[in-house]
């Protein structure tokens, strides 16, 4: 009985951590999922975006108190416009997806939603981190040495 209690406490203390991609691993994955050149956006720009939005972490979340929305996953996709978390007032859910799907180690759903985001007129400029850290910069370093 004591062993069961100890095992239970150990399991409760384990924290959930999503996949944190290595830079080149992410570049290869994004290429395989069709982001290289999608809507004219280079693979290097996508990797730069993921670096500055989530530090390549699939479990990253960020709450925005102003509109009570949350950004989810490797691309920090917002619950007000793009996904449904069941909590954000007036959510649109333009990607027709649960926000939890954007936190998976398999980033196929996140990529599909990111493609939807950049299909809007604002394109990749929808991401503040991309505008602040990647736009009009040499982003080739983000895929350098990755063989992509």
Curated annotation (Swiss-Prot):
One of its GO terms (molecular function) is lysozyme activity. It is found in: Secreted. Disulfide bonds join 24-146, 48-134, 83-99, 95-113. Residues 1-18 form the signal peptide. It catalyses: Hydrolysis of (1->4)-beta-linkages between N-acetylmuramic acid and N-acetyl-D-glucosamine residues in a peptidoglycan and between N-acetyl-D-glucosamine residues in chitodextrins. Keywords: Antimicrobial, Bacteriolytic enzyme, Disulfide bond, Glycosidase, Hydrolase, Secreted, Signal. The active site is at residues 53, 71. One of its GO terms (cellular component) is extracellular region. Residues 19-148 form the C-type lysozyme domain. The keyword Magnesium does not apply. It comes from the Eukaryota. SUPFAM superfamilies: Lysozyme-like (SSF53955). Gene3D superfamilies: 1.10.530.10. GO terms for biological process: defense response to Gram-negative bacterium; defense response to Gram-positive bacterium; killing of cells of another organism. Its EC number is 3.2.1.17. Lysozyme C is capable of both hydrolysis and transglycosylation; it also shows a slight esterase activity. It acts rapidly on both peptide-substituted and unsubstituted peptidoglycan, and slowly on chitin oligosaccharides. Lysozymes have primarily a bacteriolytic function; those in tissues and body fluids are associated with the monocyte-macrophage system and enhance the activity of immunoagents. Monomer. Belongs to the glycosyl hydrolase 22 family. This is Lysozyme C.
